[in-house]
Design a protein with these regions (language model features):
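N-terminal export/assembly segments and adjacent metallocofactor-ligating motifs
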Residues: 1-253, 365, 529, 541-543, ...
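Glycine-rich phosphate/diphosphate-binding loops that line cofactor/substrate pockets in enzymes
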Residues: 123-140, 180-188, 259-273, 289, ...
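Non-catalytic, well-ordered alpha-helical segments in soluble enzyme domains
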Residues: 405-421
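A cross-kingdom feature strongest in bacterial/archaeal respiratory oxidoreductases
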Residues: 53-54, 147, 156, 178-179, ...
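A glycine-rich, hydrophobic/aromatic-adjacent loop/helix-cap motif
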Residues: 265-316, 381, 467
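Internal, active-site/partner-interface "lid" segment
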Residues: 256-261, 418-433
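Generic, well-ordered alpha-helical scaffold segments in large soluble proteins
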Residues: 11, 15, 67, 126, ...
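Phosphate/pyrophosphate-binding active-site segments
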Residues: 241-276
Length: 596
């Protein structure tokens, strides 16, 4: 018999009925979903014992305590340590996903010389030869992004053995110098551009004390801190010193500026008060407020060692520059660093975990371990009124061919010691002095250093998760001028011209290297504006023939680039706000804009 129409209908009906009972379609859906979530390259947590380990975050100067939930030996989640005296149990978004940084694609994986892979021994030989070949007027410098560490001591010892060694730091690496901020007793903060509510000092410490201080934000951009402040006073870029002087006069009742008078009334009603920002006028304002050396103001601490601001190094004087870059630090100002190098034959060595940033301009790239891949240290937390120290034990296995920056400098100096040896000496010195107390992360208890049996026991406590905090330093006769040395000069602002009638300002820092696994949260949601976004007031855009969402071209005296126009009435008229990507190493620049 042939295949009839009845057979076709029977087969079709039976297949349809069978599909309702067979597990094949549902298995296909399940397997497809599982496979789509496990593409090659996505790290998979190990299956094993779940345990807790402790470390300290070194992505920024806050030095927050970290409790890591681990499966086997791999951390799968990070949270803050409850009761931590600096972080108050809080981690910032970058700290919460810090263990993801090891999986970023643009990592430096092996030593490079002239862009080509070399052995670490050859890199050491090349850098040593470059140092030996320097002329009598050329210096050798190390740019230290986190002064005050044991690694900083390694750098200073190495440079002390050279004829012209310079230990320097990025601008504002130590904005308050030998002083910390008594935030717990402060009742008002007058901020000149400081990101008080956006990563300033230790975020947990700021949030814990936010309810009892008034925040006045003085800056041209409507930043996140400005939007959350009790009062935002927009000022033109470069006029911050003038406004600080007006507030100082208003405190004596001698100004006609209404905004300055309002700020002065808030400061007088909420004492003790402090002013944070750069420039001599801000330092004089703190002297007027009597905030230096008193509770609720700026208090001195013991551990400060002054370091040269790289901006103060003479131009064209550095023959060999070693640059340490951290895993989570802000981009270093390459335009500034380039001016400090001798015009010809300068050698740049990048000690970095990244292939971008300064590595793009370096003659030698020495790959450094990523955060959590090697034993590290966290010095005194930013803005702390007492000295501090903690270890950051490794939680991840580091790839081969990585060299910690301090280890590289020790090998340059032909020192047989290791970086852990230097850290042990630091811990032994803390035990010998016998001051302060140690807060241990696992049990959230504080123990006086004098009650710890030996330096070895203190070292074990540090490795298990702990922070040492020194005792307070007695106050003394300090002046506001003592703070000026640490603040640094404000950035110059060029006035608009007929050719460039607008001011382009940097609004917000460039985002640090983030988690490669969390990018969908902002790439697909639009929560973060594009890197080429140019935000301006509606009137500013319309006066230049633009509409919201237009593509435009921004011109400055040094650069030209395409942008996407975004209207925002919170932006000051005559101002264009952009991220640091478009600023070409400047914070403020005159600019013009036209439709693309």
């Amino acid at each position: 018999m042939g295949f009839t129409r009845r057979d076709l209908l029977t087969f079709t009906g039976g297949s349809a009925a069978g599909m309702l009972f067979t597990p094949v379609p549902w298995s296909l859906l399940r397997d497809t979903a599982v496979l789509s979530e496990n593409w090659p390259g996505v790290p998979q947590p190990l299956h094993g014992e779940i345990r807790t380990r402790y470390t300290t975050c070194t992505l920024c100067p806050a030095g927050c305590g970290v409790r890591a939930r681990c499966v086997g030996d791999r951390p799968v989640s990070l949270v803050g340590v409850s009761g931590h005296p600096a972080s108050r149990g809080v981690l910032c978004p970058a700290g919460l996903v810090g263990h993801h940084l090891a999986f970023c694609r643009n990592r430096a994986a092996e030593p490079l010389a002239g862009g080509k892979p070399v052995a670490i021994e050859r890199a050491l030989t090349g850098v040593s030869a470059a140092i030996a070949a320097r002329g009598p007027r050329e210096s050798v410098a190390i740019l230290d992004p986190r002064p005050g560490r044991a690694a900083s001591l390694v750098y200073r010892r190495f440079l002390a053995g050279l004829p012209r060694g310079v230990h320097c730091a990025p601008p504002n690496a130590e904005p308050y110098g030998a002083f910390g901020i008594d935030l717990e007793n402060t009742r008002a903060i007058l901020s000149f551009g400081a990101p008080v509510l956006d990563g300033w000092l230790s975020p947990g410490r700021v949030l814990a004390n936010r309810s009892h201080f008034q925040l006045i934000q003085i800056e041209p951009a409507y930043s996140r801190t400005a939007s959350l402040a009790d009062l935002w006073v927009p000022v033109l870029p470069g006029s911050e010193d003038d406004f600080a002087a007006a507030v100082a006069r208003a405190l004596d009742g001698e100004t006609t500026d209404a905004h300055a008078a309002e700020v002065a009334r808030i400061l007088l009603r909420n004492k003790p008060a402090i002013a944070v920002g750069a420039g001599a006028a801000v330092a004089r304002l703190n002297a007027k407020l009597a905030s230096v050396g008193r509770p609720g103001g700026f208090l001195p601490r013991r551990d400060f060692t002054a370091v040269t601001d790289v901006a103060r190094v003479p131009d064209g004087s550095i023959g060999v520059l070693l640059i340490e870059e951290t895993a989570g630090g802000d981009p270093l100002p390459w335009d500034l660093l380039r001016r400090k190098l001798v015009p010809q034959d300068a050698v740049v060595v990048a000690l970095t975990p990244w292939l971008d940033g300064c590595a793009r301009h370096a003659d030698y790239v020495i790959p450094a371990p990523m955060y959590l891949e090697s034993l590290d240290e966290a010095p005194t937390p930013a803005g702390s009124t007492v000295a501090g120290f903690s270890l950051s034990p490794a939680l991840l296995t580091a790839p081969p061919k990585l060299t910690p920056p301090a280890e590289f400098v020790l090998r340059l100096a032909h020192d047989s010691g290791t970086y852990p040896d230097i850290l042990k000496q630091r811990v032994a010195a803390i035990k010998k002095d016998g001051r302060g107390a140690v807060f241990t992360y696992p049990d959230a208890k504080s123990t006086r250093v004098s009650d710890i049996a030996s330096a070895g026991d203190l070292w074990k406590s540090m490795l298990a998760g702990a922070v040492w905090l020194d005792g307070p330093l007695p106050g003394g006769p300090f002046r506001g001028a003592d703070l000026q040395v640490c603040a640094g000069p404000p950035g110059p602002a060029l006035p608009p011209t007929p050719e460039y009638p607008l001011l382009l300002i940097a609004a917000g820092n460039a985002p640090p290297h983030g988690s490669p696994l969390m990018s969908k949260l902002y790439r697909e949601s639009g929560l973060r504006r594009p890197a080429n976004a140019a935000t301006m007031h509606t009137d500013t855009g319309r006066n230049h023939g633009l509409a919201d969402g237009d593509q435009a071209v921004v011109n400055t005296p040094t650069a030209s680039f395409k942008v996407q126009v975004i209207f925002d009435v919170a932006v000051m008229p005559g101002i264009i706000e952009m991220g640091m990507v478009g600023m070409v190493g400047q914070a403020v620049s005159p600019a013009s804009i036209r439709r693309a």
